[in-house]
C-alpha cells in the first residue's frame, strides 16, 4: 500500500503496532512542512571517521543507526565536518548549504537494537571535545540525485 494515499490501509497496518489497551490511531494528520529538529527542512550529514573516533572514546562500536543520519560519508578526517559550516557542497547533482552542527540529545544513549541506555554519548562528547555536537545539518539549495559512492564537492 502507499501510506500517503491509502489512509485506511495505513491505519490498519499501524493497529498491529499499538498495544490493544491504548488508544488507537483514527486519522492521519499531515504537517505543512517536514518534521525535523530544525525550523527549516534539513538533512543530517555525518562521517564514519567521527563515529570511529567517538566509538574509540566510548570503548564500544556505536551503530550508525544510533544517530539517525540521512547521509554518511567515508574519507573525511574525524570532526572535519564542523569546518564545512557556512560552505556549500554538492553530492551527486544535489547542492546543499552546510548550516550548523547537530546538538545531540539523550536519545543517542539508547542502543538502537535493544532500546537500553548503554553509552554516555553526551558526556563523552563534552569531556573530549567540549560540546554535544555530532554531525551537521544541510539545507538543500538545488534539487538533484545523490547515490552511494558519490563524491562530495565543495562549491
Predicted regions and their residues:
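Metal-cofactor-dependent catalytic cores
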Residues: 1-155
Amino acid at each position: 500500500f502507499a501510506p500517503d494515499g491509502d489512509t485506511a490501509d495505513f491505519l490498519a497496518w499501524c493497529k498491529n503496532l499499538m498495544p490493544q489497551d491504548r488508544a488507537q490511531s483514527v486519522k492521519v494528520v499531515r504537517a505543512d512542512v517536514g518534521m525535523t529538529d530544525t525550523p527549516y527542512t534539513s538533512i543530517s550529514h555525518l562521517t564514519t571517521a567521527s563515529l570511529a573516533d567517538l566509538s574509540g572514546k566510548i570503548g564500544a562500536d556505536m551503530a550508525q543507526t544510533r544517530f539517525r543520519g540521512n547521509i554518511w560519508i567515508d574519507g573525511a578526517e574525524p570532526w572535519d565536518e564542523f569546518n564545512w559550516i557556512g560552505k556549500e557542497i554538492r553530492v551527486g547533482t544535489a547542492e546543499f548549504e552546510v548550516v550548523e552542527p547537530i546538538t545531540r540529545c539523550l536519545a543517542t544513549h539508547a542502543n538502537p537494537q535493544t532500546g537500553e541506555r548503554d553509552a554516555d554519548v553526551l558526556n563523552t562528547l563534552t569531556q573530549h571535545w567540549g560540546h554535544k555536537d555530532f554531525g551537521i545539518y544541510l539545507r538543500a539549495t538545488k534539487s538533484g540525485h545523490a547515490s552511494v559512492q558519490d563524491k562530495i564537492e565543495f562549491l
